[in-house]
Amino acid sequence: MTPKSHLSQIAASLHLDACGACSASLDSTLKEQLRNAGPIPFAPSSLAERLDPSALLRDARSFFVILFPYRPAREEEGNIALYARPMDYHKVIHRYLQKIIETARPSYPGEQFLPLVDTSPMVDRWLAYAAGLGFFGRNHCLIHPTYGSFVTIGSILTTLSLTPDQPLTLDCG
């Protein structure tokens, strides 16, 4: 079993079915887009910090990216964003990522793992796109073919070499 399929199997045992992998060497297209975007609220102003996974984990080689769908079973009235209604998703996702890491770690002695939610400097939507988990809509949201844009994103930065997935070639019109 490959490391990627092992991580996917662990995620599936936790009922997480939207997983993929991408290289920790970030694409030049992303670098250009970030340069042109200018300052982004809640993100580090330094492009180098947003584009250098090895600043977070030395010898990082891959990201294992997981989507966490959050659309409720029924629509509720209200003016609070759907992702903000349940428990703090940062804590929930972090617990799932830690469980995956704890389960995988004994199989990969000497390898390192770092759980990331959207509080890291990494560009989580781009990682999910690069890992084949969705495409960008006109609104710049990541859209998954099944879950739509009702997802939050978590990833595991690792020194493991994971076979990268291909980005989806879909669009919304």
What are the residue ranges of the model-derived segments?
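Auxiliary alpha/beta "docking" domains used to position bulky ligands
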Residues: 1-172
